[in-house]
């Protein structure tokens, strides 16, 4: 039920610098908000830096060093700190609200771009990529970008100010002691970078595995009818349990990596405090530093360690954000194989004549040619049927016309215009497709019909339904045209869904029509009703029909029989029977009750 490959194009791992450069254009769109956020961050940092100095003044004054301590001085210092805390509160509010909202805007922009890019990717990408994986990339993977976008510049900016300010202030108190404390920082940095790399690898594995798990869940839930029909609940539970256990194991390894990272930072915290206790205590004993300065020194070291710890705690969030950006970049770096040529022009209106000139096609991951040197002229308004064994290239040939796939060589022309030289939008607007497996969107009947012509009036929608023979059953529904059809149209029968799909194409009113085995999965009654609707739809249009039931195409203008070597037979129903070739054998294999 699932697709065969995960197609994780992110087998390569971009460097952090490359990912940040990829992210910066999104951040630049909100540079004014960011600058104000960083200004507020500087204000909050000021409060943290000033407090140790206030405590140093009070302690030294109380011990007779420097100015004499009075109630007035205490009140002035308290008033100063009170004002700073008011400023800190206002700045913190801005950072917590507007800063996060900026992150939400960036996440929204990235998700929009990812979705827009996904819509441009061709069928090959979706044939090889699990929907659960794609969903994870444009939803969960970008959730962490909100926190990353807000906190990354803010945390590093605050850390930079505090570390530089602490270093300068600590050096003024005691250069040897400060150098001893900061000697721990490079070693801490090396260990942190190594452990951070392990942490990021674990987060990436988690994202890949949750995509696999989502695909398993999606398969089981969407295919619940098949699961129940085959009493395969146990197999589905085992399949889910296997994926769930794999995710559990990967997440467990991630927490081990996180534990090692946090433990290393605590050890370095303790080492820095130990240096202050030893070196600071000895400096106090030998009169190299005052008690007030040692108190301030300890508070500044505490501020420094708190800053480092905050960066360490942010590392997990940082790596989650980087993983999200990396997987976003992988989507955006997936090349758009089928797109408008630089000089593409809109397809000029015409009657709908189609020409294949020496067309060859092979799938990108399979070098066996599906079509080889196919040359074919289809007259405007002609009804052409394609028959033959499965795998003969019938659907592929039809899929080349709207450029769902690109020809390997040769060319296809519509009304004399090379389809690779016209815009995709104008090309596909001129082609209506009714498939065997109809997809209805979650919404109402009217909304699904209107998909054929965005902005269509209610009158146009109802007229299309009448032409498709769908009006009678629609009006019999509880809410008529406003009836909710369920996910993928689950509340409607196969024949009802087909007629809504036909109504869509009536509303679109294209000159070219492709019917891909549109009635092969229906019961006899539904087939008759849908067949009548298709007859009306095909009238006056160039129509290509892929048919398994040969009785439905007896009256077609021309029938092509496709095989491994290409077009093996061509002619009307009567002509092909007279040849007594492949078509003749296919016709004689039909059961007598099938309408022969």
Pin down the residues of each PLM region.
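Juxtamembrane loop-to-helix connectors within ABC transporter transmembrane domains
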Residues: 19, 27, 95, 99-103, ...
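Helix-loop-helix
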Residues: 64-66, 70-72, 76-79, 169-183, ...
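Hydrophobic alpha-helical transmembrane bundles that constitute the permease/transmembrane domains
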Residues: 38, 42-53, 82-93, 145-148, ...
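An intracellular "coupling" helix at the cytosolic face of ABC transporter transmembrane type-1 domains
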Residues: 32, 123-124, 140-149, 153, ...
